[in-house]
Amino acid sequence: MPKKDGAIEIEGRVVEPLPNAMFRVELQNGHRVLAHISGKMRQHYIRILPEDRVVVELSPYDLSRGRIVYRYK
């Protein structure tokens, strides 16, 4: 997985789906963030359901929002 420069990758669990392909994700450290699906996952029609384990990429500028870049099988 290519990583964006300066982005922080952390594992989490999807808590609830929200409209417009957004999800509330609980990170390993207990924080909850708002995350959207990355473009490549959208292109390949990867479905994300509640309770899925995912990898979230957080920007160092806004740690309350992120991008889901991987869903564990």
UniProtKB/Swiss-Prot annotation:
Highest taxon of the lineage: Bacteria
SS bonds (residue pairs): none
Domain (S1-like): residue spans on this chain: 1-73
Primary localization class, coarse: cytoplasm
Molecular function via GO: ribosome binding; rRNA binding; translation initiation factor activity
GO cellular component: cytosol
CDD domains recorded: S1_IF1
Record-linked PROSITE patterns: S1_IF1_TYPE
Subcellular location: Cytoplasm
Keywords: Cytoplasm, Initiation factor, Protein biosynthesis, RNA-binding, rRNA-binding
Gene3D superfamilies attached to this UniProt entry: Nucleic acid-binding proteins (2.40.50.140)
InterPro entries, per database record: NA-bd_OB-fold, RNA-binding_domain_S1_IF1, TIF_IF1
Quaternary assembly: Component of the 30S ribosomal translation pre-initiation complex which assembles on the 30S ribosome in the order IF-2 and IF-3, IF-1 and N-formylmethionyl-tRNA(fMet); mRNA recruitment can occur at any time during PIC assembly.
Function comment: One of the essential components for the initiation of protein synthesis. Stabilizes the binding of IF-2 and IF-3 on the 30S subunit to which N-formylmethionyl-tRNA(fMet) subsequently binds. Helps modulate mRNA selection, yielding the 30S pre-initiation complex (PIC). Upon addition of the 50S ribosomal subunit IF-1, IF-2 and IF-3 are released leaving the mature 70S translation initiation complex.
Homology family: Belongs to the IF-1 family.
PANTHER family: TRANSLATION INITIATION FACTOR IF-1, CHLOROPLASTIC
Protein name: Translation initiation factor IF-1
Organism the protein comes from: Frankia alni (strain DSM 45986 / CECT 9034 / ACN14a)
